[in-house]
Design a protein with these regions (language model features):
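Short hydrophobic/aromatic patch on the recognition helix
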Residues: 64-74
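Residues in the recognition helix of alpha-helical DNA-binding motifs
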Residues: 73-74, 83, 199
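Amphipathic alpha-helical segments used for helix-helix packing
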Residues: 85, 96-97, 117-142, 183-184
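Amphipathic alpha-helical packing segments from all-alpha helical-bundle domains
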Residues: 118-125, 138-171, 198-209
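Amphipathic C-terminal alpha-helical segment
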Residues: 170-193, 206-211
Length: 211
């Protein structure tokens, strides 16, 4: 038997065997993936625009597909939420990473607040939507709890001095740095981003006993 790519004894070229990767993409598969992504993008856009409790019907209308198409791609809204989290998780978690984590405790407190403030401002609609929907969504409850654990761990990385605090102050630090506190300052108390940062900074200074 001759090797692929070489001529046989009769000088007839061997048949070329195409690998699956060389085959043309299946048109139906491409349309399916396109429709699926349109649905995902539609939900993300609606939430970003302030529609915090989007329905399958509003998602279908925004995506330009029938509601049956939505449920052909996703068994239910839970499946859609889970898929979106997979797509967005790396990008939203990345907003909290990095930053200047050196310096004195007070300097690191300020840097941590700046990092969180930027993330909270960018993710506000997504987080508010999650809060509004998660009472009936096990997927969102699970994801929210996971994210809260991650944020708590990240804050301890910024401020390892947390470990030496009494239990009640540890909880005070976590509460002061939370999105819920941030949203209250911004939405309910009407403070600017800068003023909200100063309030959180003062709360953390008090929790750490910085005079």
């Amino acid at each position: 038997m001759t090797k692929a790519g070489k001529r046989s004894i009769g000088n007839k070229p061997d048949a070329v065997i195409h690998s699956p990767e060389e085959k043309k993409p299946d048109g139906r598969l491409l349309r399916t993936e396109r429709s699926r992504q349109l649905i995902i993008d539609a939900l993300c856009d609606l939430v970003q625009e302030g529609v915090l409790v989007p329905t399958a019907q509003t998602v279908a209308e925004r995506a330009g597909v029938g509601i049956r198409t939505v449920f052909r791609h996703f068994a239910d809204m839970e499946a859609l939420f889970a898929t979106i989290d997979i797509q967005l998780r790396e990008s939203y978690e990345g907003l909290y990473l990095g930053g200047d984590r050196d310096g004195s405790l007070e300097e690191r407190i300020r840097h941590a607040i700046e990092r969180r403030a930027a993330a909270y401002e960018k993710l506000s609609s997504l987080m508010l939507s999650t809060r509004a929907l998660m009472w009936r969504s096990p997927v969102l409850q699970k994801n929210y709890a996971r994210n809260q654990r991650g944020l708590r761990k990240d804050l301890a990385d910024w401020l390892p001095e947390i470990a030496a605090l009494p239990a009640v102050r540890k909880e005070a630090v976590d509460a002061a740095a939370s999105f819920e506190t941030w949203d209250r300052l911004r939405s309910q108390q009407g403070l600017s981003t800068r003023a909200s940062m100063e309030v959180v900074h003062e709360m953390l200074r008090l929790a750490f006993g910085i005079g």
